Amino acid sequence: MRTSVFVALVVATFVATCISFTSAKNVAQIRDVDGGNNVQETRTLAEADDWWLASTNTEERSGGAGFFSKLRGKVHAKQSSGVMTTQKLNDQQVKTITKEVATTVKKDRRTWPMIKKGLKILYGALLAGLIIVGVEAMLS
């Protein structure tokens, strides 16, 4: 990308954000309007003992569990049951796999670019997953 295009993009972004700041200064201030949002009003919540007797109008419910919290719960359940444990490869197994890959690449050199592309896609997907998990952990 040329530097002039980049500078034009930065200037356009700056101008767009400044317009919203200037329009926010000119907004009329509305006072003494009662919207019925009194802070001192109390909301009725269901008691801990009779939560099943309360109607849905008086009961405060949280939204459903998010995707990541459900996923985190499933992973935790599998880890606690011991299903997630994997065996580590020893040196002999690693050498065997390396030899098999090397013979495949020697037989047909056209397969190496496909293997390389697959590894790049795998790396990108894992990196994106780690970023998403990191952001989710920081937000919660």
From Swiss-Prot:
It is a single-pass membrane protein. Its main location: secreted. GO terms for cellular component: extracellular region; host cell; membrane. It is found in: Secreted; Host cell; Membrane. A motif (RxLR-dEER) lies at residues 43-61. The chain crosses the membrane at residues 119-139. The keyword Signal applies. Disulfide bonds: none annotated. Residues 1-24 form the signal peptide. Induction: Expression is induced during host plant infection. Keywords: Membrane, Secreted, Signal, Transmembrane, Transmembrane helix, Virulence. The keyword Transmembrane helix applies. Effector that is involved in host plant infection. Contributes to virulence during the early infection stage, by inhibiting plant defense responses induced by both PAMP-triggered immunity (PTI) and effector-triggered immunity (ETI). The RxLR-dEER motif acts to carry the protein into the host cell cytoplasm through binding to cell surface phosphatidylinositol-3-phosphate. This is RxLR effector protein CRE9. It comes from Phytophthora infestans (strain T30-4) (Potato late blight agent).
